[in-house]
Amino acid sequence: MAEVVILIGLQASGKSTFFRRTFAGTHVHLSKDHFPNAKRRQERQLRMLTEALEEGRSVVVDNTNPSPEEWTPLIEVARRHGARVSGYWFPPDLEGSQERNARRSAKTRVPDVGLYATLKRLRRPSAEDGFDELYTVGFDGEGGFVVERG
């Protein structure tokens, strides 16, 4: 059974690094960062998700996904294709995200206003939102991650 993993958290919260370390060998990486200047980015992402699921492939959606407005359409596509849906919540740490963001290249750095806008909309997901499984992800203090169910 295919799986759709939805990463939820601020920019520079470790989501892409977590993907590379945890899912890169088994899941398709789907991120709007791959097509930053494209028109209709949401529609394109949903189309790519649909195509991957039709091929029986599991997918990680690596965006901020701060609210049901972003994750509900993803969950609906997953359900239509019989896929499980897992959410990985990266609790907000604005100061830590700002520090990591400042170390990014100019090309990938997000303006602080972008972090604040996402923080304002960011909501912790729940099972009532349609997720089959939910996990909380944090840093382990040694360059890795700690993942806890719930």
Regions found by a protein language model. Name each.
Residues 27-29, 85-87, 133-136:
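Conserved beta-strand scaffold positions in the cores of enzyme catalytic domains, especially
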Residues 3-5, 57-61, 85:
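Generic beta-sheet signal
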Residues 13-69:
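Conserved substrate/cofactor phosphate-moiety recognition/catalytic segment
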Residues 67-100:
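Mid-chain, well-packed structural core segment of small domains
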Residues 47-48, 73, 117, 121:
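Alpha-helical elements of Rossmann-like donor-binding domains used by nucleotide-donor carbohydrate transfer enzymes
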Residues 50-54, 79, 127:
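Residue-level signal for alpha-helix termini/capping positions
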Residues 1-9, 13, 24, 80, ...:
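Conserved GTP-binding G-domain of TRAFAC-class P-loop NTPases and closely related GTPase folds
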